[in-house]
Amino acid sequence: MKININKNWVHGLIWSLMIIFFIFFPPVYAKFYLKQGIPVQIEYDFLQQTEDVEYAVDGLDTIVYDGENLYRFWGWAFQTKDLSEKQSDYERILVIRSNSNIYFFPLTAMPSQDIQVAYKGLNMDLTNVRYSAFIAKDFIAPGIYSVEIIFKHRINGTSFYRKTDVKMIRTPNRLVIKQ
């Protein structure tokens, strides 16, 4: 007995399944498979904006870390609001914000002597003011984002932030920064 199957029906079914896959797979992949570069949840009350922060955004590179395709955001920043405070007393958090979305990424300190040499007149320990953060673009909605850095004191909890002149742009295919 021969089964008669319409070729157009089979092609329609295959195309429908492919479309469903490409629509629903990226969020499922991001939620269940990515372990690095995930935005964190923090309480973000009204913070004082300050200009008492020296900073530079050095780059946004694509990297593969633990088998995951990520972006590494890196640069340096330190507060000059209270020169008696140690820089290590502050936790730094990367904020990327658009009109409709806001994401927070913890910044990891990286040792470096070049900032210490450049700002030797401040008499501060600046050896760990370099930072980097892993960012998985699959968690970020397409759009144009402003970049901010939050400084949160580890002991007394006071916080302030510096808005940078850097824009982060998330397109459907990539993440870029414009300075």
Where are these regions (language model features)?
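N-terminal secretory signal peptides that target proteins for export/translocation
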Residues: 1-5
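Basic, ligand-binding patches in group-transfer machinery
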Residues: 7-179
